[in-house]
From Swiss-Prot:
Compartments in which it is found: Cytoplasm
Biological processes per GO annotation: coenzyme A biosynthetic process
Enzyme class: transferase
Record-linked InterPro entries: Cyt_trans-like, PPAT, Rossmann-like_a/b/a_fold
Family: Belongs to the bacterial CoaD family.
Residues carrying the site annotation Transition state stabilizer: 21
Gene Ontology cellular component annotations, sorted alphabetically: cytoplasm
Protein name in UniProt: Phosphopantetheine adenylyltransferase
Catalytic reactions of this protein: (R)-4'-phosphopantetheine + ATP + H(+) = 3'-dephospho-CoA + diphosphate
EC number(s) from the headed UniProt entry: 2.7.7.3
Length: 149
């Protein structure tokens, strides 16, 4: 891998990976040569699908992306900043839809910087029409749809 490549990781529980994530990924690819989508644990969330299921679903969602620029990894036991260091990524991609997300991301960014001083967190803001998309809402909608069946 070239030393000049701008490498980023885009971590998330991705349960599920949705159009909002895809939108942020597209924006990240305008800035970076390689983006690792890292399926990881979020201690603040209860996931509904296994790592393997999420990896398969995510890989199917990104079939139209250049495989040399987007790769999917599973992280079960390392901190995000440690994964970035192992992969040679100098950037962590995150997104914030509102002030609550922003405050949360601010704390995460500071923690990641303390663990890995070489990493910078890049917040990519969604376009206006994508602001309301989130995984929890999608899971709740699916749950309600299943109740109606």
């Amino acid at each position: 891998m070239s030393m000049n490549k701008k490498i980023a990781i885009f971590p998330g529980s991705f349960d599920p990976f949705h159009n909002g994530h895809k939108h942020i990924l597209n924006k990240a690819l305008a800035l970076f040569d390689l983006v690792y989508l890292v399926i990881t644990i979020n201690p603040d969330k209860i996931t509904k699908t296994s790592f393997d299921q999420r990896k398969t679903l995510l890989e199917n969602e990104i079939l139209d992306f250049d495989k040399s620029r987007v790769q999917v990894l599973v992280n079960k036991d390392s901190l995000t900043a440690e994964i970035a260091k192992k992969l040679g990524a100098k950037f962590i991609i995150r997104s914030a839809r509102n002030d609550i997300d922003y405050q949360y991301e601010l704390v995460l960014a500071a923690g990641n910087k303390k663990i890995n001083n070489e990493v910078e967190t890049i917040l990519i803001f969604p376009d206006y029409d994508k602001i309301e998309i989130n995984s929890t809402l999608i899971r709740h909608q699916k749950f309600i749809e299943n109740l109606k069946k």
